[in-house]
């Protein structure tokens, strides 16, 4: 290996490490959301539809709302929804999409990092987050924080990627960010009763490629 080859490989690894770090930090998402290209489909996440359709609409908090697809769906079902994300550009996109969808009057927006989330005394009938994956197993701490925002009689819904051979191309930091639903149970206080704790298979087609993966799904209800 020549010095030039080694340097080129080192630069590639450095760029990859930086990209991985950016994936978990606000700056990386601010950059992604700064352009005009739509990143997500805008469709609601399927486990949200499955679990929430039968609930009585009230107030909802969607943490890690991105471009607002789940927020808009909830608002259309009659919920009053707060979309929360650590990206100001993402929140701006979500607000525009809500306006275009005709549900701006049922939505509001909150810039917050889930890793340091404090509900500041606010509670919601539904607290939900989908595919939020803080690094190094940090989801347990995030769930502990989200629990504080669940009103008496309210629900917490957490959905994420379960470890799967589908994700073999990702690095170890991404793998450590994945979780199974059972791992989150330690974050639930006694008055939050698990309703659903499972990995649900889902077939996804993106860019013409179809893969099978599992959604780690935790639904819990607070007594009261």
Predicted regions and their residues:
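Conserved SAM-binding strand-loop segment of SAM-dependent methyltransferases
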Residues: 102-114
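A short SAM/SAH-binding and catalytic strip from SAM-dependent methyltransferases
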Residues: 125-139
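Conserved SAM/SAH-binding beta-strand->alpha-helix loop
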Residues: 87-89
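Conserved beta-strand signature within the Rossmann-like core of class I S-adenosyl-L-methionine
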Residues: 153-161
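A short acidic, Gly/Pro-enriched loop at the edge of an enzyme's catalytic core
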Residues: 115, 119-126
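Conserved class I S-adenosyl-L-methionine
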Residues: 2-55, 58-66, 164
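A short glycine-rich, Lys/Arg-flanked "PGG" loop and its adjoining helix->strand segment in the class I
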Residues: 140-152
């Amino acid at each position: 290996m020549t010095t030039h080859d080694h340097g080129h490989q080192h630069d590639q690894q450095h760029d990859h490490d930086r990209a991985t770090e950016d994936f978990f930090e606000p700056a990386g998402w601010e950059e992604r959301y700064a352009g005009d290209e739509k990143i997500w489909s805008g469709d609601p996440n399927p486990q949200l539809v499955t679990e929430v359709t039968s609930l009585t609409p009230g107030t909802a908090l969607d943490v890690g709302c991105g471009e607002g697809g789940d927020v808009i769906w909830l608002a259309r079902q009659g919920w009053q929804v707060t979309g929360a994300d650590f990206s100001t550009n993402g929140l701006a996109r979500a607000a525009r999409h809500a306006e275009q969808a005709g549900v701006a009057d049922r939505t509001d927006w909150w810039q917050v990092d889930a890793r340091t989330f404090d509900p500041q005394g606010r509670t919601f009938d539904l607290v939900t987050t989908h595919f939020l994956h803080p690094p190094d197993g940090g989801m347990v701490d995030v769930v502990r924080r989200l629990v504080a925002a669940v009103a008496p009689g309210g629900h917490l819904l957490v959905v994420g990627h379960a470890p799967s051979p589908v994700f073999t191309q990702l690095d170890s930091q991404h793998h450590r960010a994945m979780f199974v639903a059972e791992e989150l149970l330690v974050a639930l206080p006694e008055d939050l009763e698990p309703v659903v704790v499972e990995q649900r298979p889902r077939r996804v087609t993106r860019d013409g490629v179809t893969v099978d993966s599992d959604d780690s799904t935790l639904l819990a209800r607070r007594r009261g």
